[in-house]
Curated annotation (Swiss-Prot):
Component of the 30S ribosomal translation pre-initiation complex which assembles on the 30S ribosome in the order IF-2 and IF-3, IF-1 and N-formylmethionyl-tRNA(fMet); mRNA recruitment can occur at any time during PIC assembly. It is found in: Cytoplasm. GO terms for cellular component: cytosol. NCBIfam families: infA. This is Translation initiation factor IF-1. GO terms for molecular function: ribosome binding; rRNA binding; translation initiation factor activity. Belongs to the IF-1 family. The gene is infA. Residues 1-73 form the S1-like domain. PROSITE patterns: S1_IF1_TYPE. Keywords: Cytoplasm, Initiation factor, Protein biosynthesis, RNA-binding, rRNA-binding. One of the essential components for the initiation of protein synthesis. Stabilizes the binding of IF-2 and IF-3 on the 30S subunit to which N-formylmethionyl-tRNA(fMet) subsequently binds. Helps modulate mRNA selection, yielding the 30S pre-initiation complex (PIC). Upon addition of the 50S ribosomal subunit IF-1, IF-2 and IF-3 are released leaving the mature 70S translation initiation complex.
Length: 73
């Protein structure tokens, strides 16, 4: 599996669902980012609803887009 060099993991809360499995997420520091679901979450049919607390991976190159990698229970 590929190593995750330089990714930033941060907690956030889903604000609204968008088309094509995209979500608007408000991060713990107050920023709002556009995030999509990671492939493994999609494969295991993990549903994400507004209000869910999630972990988002951000690339250091584009801090406005991210990938949702975990949903808290």
């Amino acid at each position: 599996m590929a190593k995750k060099d330089g990714v930033i993991e941060i907690e956030g809360q889903v604000i609204e669902p968008l088309p094509n499995a995209m979500f608007r997420v408000e991060l713990a520091n107050g920023h709002k980012v556009l995030a999509h679901i990671s492939g493994k979450m999609r494969m295991h049919y993990i549903r994400i609803l507004p209000g869910d607390r999630v972990v988002v991976e951000l690339s250091p190159y584009d801090l406005n887009r991210g990938r949702i990698v975990y949903r808290y229970r």
